[in-house]
Structures are given as structure tokens and as C-alpha cells.
């Protein structure tokens, strides 16, 4: 599917006989560049519905684009799940990286209750993440935005109302050397999920930056998904 804010593509065999993974690419990474990671998940036995997002979500320096993007992807995921369920698919999980992780953070729980397990490949405060990227900080500052104003604009996205997450299992992959979404800040991101009843584990990946943390998480994708889907088999 094509939309002005995102594109999507499906990979793998019939979803009826396999678990389905909702896969959201990192910021500014098209599906084409994530194909290796996607193929490894398909070989591990998953049907994959992949999404890529427009870089304009941040390069346009308009904070209203992000909530619109999340809303549209949520709507599309709901439609995909309903269609796949009608074809016999029963299990739905996710794998999101960087911005994709934040988008899926706003999809679990009451928004899309079918997503009961999955992987957040890096995660944290989205406003600080944007502000920690010099090019994006410059673009937003030129439009009159400051870090406090961005945090205010995205406050509802940063603290979504999950409802209850009892029985949900999530894995967060992170690195203490990630300067964009550092491991030391992840507790603020996890605590609301823990309070809502989810089982959450943290996996530290070897990395020297946000980019390499994301790449390491993608490479370990099948292992991280197993940790979330069937923790006793890892």
C-alpha cells in the first residue's frame, strides 16, 4: 500500500500457517534497504508486513506530522490484521526499529490488542532523540521549535494510554553507547508498560552509536523475536 506518509509490503508464505510480524523500518530507511533483515525473519518462519515512513515526518520540522503518521499506520495495521485473521492467521507480533519502535509503542494495548508480543529495537524520548540529531535540531530550531516545545507537542505520544497489558511480552534492544536513545533513559519508557501488566525484558546490543545499535538489533532480529514470542525456547 502507498500513502503520502508511508508505504507497506508483505513478505513470506501464507500467514495462515505462521505468525505474522508487523515490521516498521527505522527512520529514513526504505523497505528495500531492510530486505536482508526482513528475509531473515521470513526464513525464521514469520509472515512479515513491512512499513517504511516518509523522512518528511522530521525533515519538514512540523510536529503535527508525527501523530498523523502514527494514526494512519495504526489504521492500516488494524485493516491488515483483520484481513489476515479472516484468512486464518491467529498470532500477531511486531518488530520496530528507531522511529518504527516509537510508532509501535503507540500501537500496543488498547489501540491494537492483537499485538501481544514483539520487539522494540531501541527506544526512548522521541523529542530528545530528534533534538540529539544535529541536522534535525537545526531544521526545527529554524522553525521556532525548542526541545521543551517538542516534548509538549508529543507528550500524548510519549505517554500513551495502554490500558491493560496483562499477558503481553515485549523485548527492548538498546545500547548504553547509543547517544540518540541511550540505555540509561530506557526505564522511563518501560515503566508505563510494566505498570500496565506487561512482561518486559531488556537486551543490550554491542554498538558505538544509535545507527549501529539499530543495525545490531536488526541482525539479531530472529533471536529477539523468539525472546518475545517463546521466551522458554531461547
Feature locations, PLM:
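C-terminal catalytic histidine-bearing segment of alpha/beta-hydrolase fold enzymes
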Residues: 196-234
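Alpha/beta-hydrolase active-site loop
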Residues: 64-86
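Short, surface-exposed "cap/lid" segments of acyl-processing enzymes
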Residues: 14-54
Amino acid at each position: 500500500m502507498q500513502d503520502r506518509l508511508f508505504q507497506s509490503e508483505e513478505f513470506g508464505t501464507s500467514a495462515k500457517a505462521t505468525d505474522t510480524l508487523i515490521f516498521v523500518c527505522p527512520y529514513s530507511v526504505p523497505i528495500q534497504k531492510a530486505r536482508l533483515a526482513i528475509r531473515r525473519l521470513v526464513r525464521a518462519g514469520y509472515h512479515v508486513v513491512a512499513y517504511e515512513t516518509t523522512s518528511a515526518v522530521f525533515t519538514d520540522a512540523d510536529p503535527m506530522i508525527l501523530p498523523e503518521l502514527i494514526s494512519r499506520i495504526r489504521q492500516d495495521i488494524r485493516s491488515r490484521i483483520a484481513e489476515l485473521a479472516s484468512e486464518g492467521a491467529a498470532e500477531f507480533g511486531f518488530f520496530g526499529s528507531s522511529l518504527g519502535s516509537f510508532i509501535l509503542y503507540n500501537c500496543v494495548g488498547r489501540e491494537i490488542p492483537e499485538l501481544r508480543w514483539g520487539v522494540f529495537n531501541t527506544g526512548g524520548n522521541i523529542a530528545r532523540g530528534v533534538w540529539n540529531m544535529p541536522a534535525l535540531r537545526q531544521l526545527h530550531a529554524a522553525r521556532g521549535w525548542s526541545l521543551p516545545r517538542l516534548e509538549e507537542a508529543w507528550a500524548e505520544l510519549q505517554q500513551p494510554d495502554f490500558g491493560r497489558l496483562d499477558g503481553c511480552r515485549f523485548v527492548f534492544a538498546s545500547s548504553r553507547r547509543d547517544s540518540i536513545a541511550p540505555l540509561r533513559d530506557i526505564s522511563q519508557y518501560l515503566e508505563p508498560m510494566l505498570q500496565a501488566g506487561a512482561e518486559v525484558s531488556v537486551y543490550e546490543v554491542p554498538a558505538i552509536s544509535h545507527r549501529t545499535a539499530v543495525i545490531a538489533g536488526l541482525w539479531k532480529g530472529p533471536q529477539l523475536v523468539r525472546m518475545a514470542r517463546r521466551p522458554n525456547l531461547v
